[in-house]
Amino acid sequence: MQLTPQQQALLDGAQGETMAKVVKTLVMYGDTFGAQRMVPVTSEYGHTVISFGLAVMKPVYDLYDRLIESGLTSGQKFTADPLPLDKHVPTSLLEDIVFRKIMYTQQDRYEQQLKKLGITADNAYTCTCYLDQVGNTPKQGDILSWAESSAVVYANSVLGARCNRNSGMLELMGSIAGFVPEFGLLTDEGRKAHWLVEVKCTRRPEAQLLGSAIGMKVMEDVPYVRGLDKWLGTELNDENRAYLKDFGAATASNGAVGLYHVEHLTPEAKQQGEALLREGYRTYIIDDAELERVKRSYPVIWKDPAAAPQLCFVGCPHLTLEQLKEWTAKLTDALRAQNRLQVAVPTVFTAAPAVLDAFKDTVEGYKLQSMGVILSYICPLMYMNNPLCKKKAVITNSNKLRTYTSARYYTDAEILDILTRKEGR
């Protein structure tokens, strides 16, 4: 790797041993993937995927102490992934003891570290940092040092920024150093598509299900999706951005997608079209039957597959303001149709703190809470990591949460039926 004189000086210890180790780590990372040089991080803000103070990760927090003691705060302010704990989310006494006395014993320490390292605000914890209410929205062409897979794939695909699927800690090191190795999705060639995905469904495909199918098929490759504009149109409005948020999260978690192109819709697909397809690309055709096949393939790992749901999570990734309002309208109509006032299953909707602040005082906010829905800022995955919570019959509309936990996936329509106890559910 060819370093600039300034970068070489940092590696040689010009700003101390700790900074030299940060740069050495980035150099080794780049060498692993064949990077020839470093490129500056150009986004206004960073984002860190580690937002939880797990006891087993104490060495990580010890390393962060060393960074702070060496004066190496982030070169850019940053947001962070969602917090793991919220007293409003249902837990038993024993579950709460496990959360606070066994699992997340480093939480207070870590949140104080993030303040010293440069987090933007006390409420800057969300996986959807790119939403307007949060304010960490990169521009097309910006070079990022992020790691959260759902945020990386959104920034690359919907915003046209450039970021690799980095690991936790490495992304913060990129923000501290101010540069990252250039390879993969930071390059023009690395952003070309290996797959042409033709969507031939007779109705708008469920975002989380379509993303799952594509992710499992292409894995870490870049897909170019054709035919989705039939259902979404050609404008990146609020509804479509929310759809692509959920779609992308499923591609990234059910596979390892860091970038997708949607013909006639996403920025680079609009600008370059079929030129994004690399020579020798493969084709994957998705129709209604293929989506149903994928859905049927999901394992049910509950101890009792016929158990009644005990808890429902909606919002992985975090919901947008528009999605909260849409869910409120759907639940209102569905409950009225069943002559019910409240949801039949304890239900938690998760969103960024700033989004929740904007929603709670609206008419829809009062309505949703009156229906028994709990609004929270947590990461559902962090909740499900509790071994006692894993034993619960938890349902979700998130394919990411299904993939990483014991939660059982249902489509939005199926979730509505379960929450309102529609006949047959």
Region locations from a protein language model:
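Non-transmembrane, aqueous-exposed alpha-helical and coiled segments at domain scale
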Residues: 1-425
